[in-house]
């Protein structure tokens, strides 16, 4: 049986995977990046480093690789005159993009397990009394749940395009859902929180009347209602907040090791290991015995028995708390 080292967040091996990725990653950055605040959550920290400003992708890459490797990486939806100012008023807001967030786990009942990483027993509380350590939680994200999120995203895109004449961009969040972003300029960028709330409520179907007897092919809400679409399930606060942080496209999500990825065609999206940039194999040491769906495949793990699995799967399982990546095997 393998030796448990109480994986507290991330190991140096996981950090090396992330650093090697960012050495060559082509991050999708806004053309006006000098007007954006950048932020990150470093490895081994529960707090964010904020109020960062960069003028080029090279400057950003140097900072990430050599000074502050990110577990999570963001830039602001807002444009500021002084994005590095620590006081929000001093930043001087100039407008914001329009954001929508769809979390697939809000659409499904997912299997959740809380356990002790030392003894492997299921535990209800946040601490194992037997071993005096904090417990870990694993939530199984299924392909079926992601499909539900994708369907909600498809409905949202239709509303934004057909009812508002907007050109939304869709991104897989890197973990459990989708981000939809509209690059805003002029009056769109200057929408305040109340106006954005009205847009959020519209796409959620709040206050939209029923249209019994209408055609499924009718435009707008008449057709949607008669197709059984009563609204889109979004995180309303994300849309309302004019100073929201956005995950940088092509960055890595620290809870999965998957890429925050542009989805140009929703019909082509698949929740599988191609969303991971990592190749080769890892030796993975499971904390518990479990059979679970991982990126579209069923994986069987036995507590304390090392297993050789693809790096994409091993890193995902590590970041999802199911065990530790012990070694990299080419």
From Swiss-Prot:
Zn(2+) binds at residues 116, 119, 128, 131. Pfam families: DNA_primase_S, PriS_C. It is an enzyme of class 2 (transferase). Its cofactor is Mg(2+); Mn(2+). One of its GO terms (biological process) is DNA replication, synthesis of primer. The keyword Transcription applies. The active site is at residues 101, 103, 235. One of its GO terms (molecular function) is metal ion binding. Changing residue 165 to I: Partial destabilization of PriS-PriL complex. SUPFAM superfamilies: Prim-pol domain. GO terms for cellular component: DNA-directed RNA polymerase complex; primosome complex. Catalytic subunit of DNA primase, an RNA polymerase that catalyzes the synthesis of short RNA molecules used as primers for DNA polymerase during DNA replication. The small subunit contains the primase catalytic core and has DNA synthesis activity on its own. Binding to the large subunit stabilizes and modulates the activity, increasing the rate of DNA synthesis while decreasing the length of the DNA fragments, and conferring RNA synthesis capability. The DNA polymerase activity may enable DNA primase to also catalyze primer extension after primer synthesis. Heterodimer of a small subunit (PriS) and a large subunit (PriL). Belongs to the eukaryotic-type primase small subunit family. This is DNA primase small subunit PriS. The lineage of its organism: Archaea, Thermoproteota, Thermoprotei, Sulfolobales, Sulfolobaceae. The gene is priS.
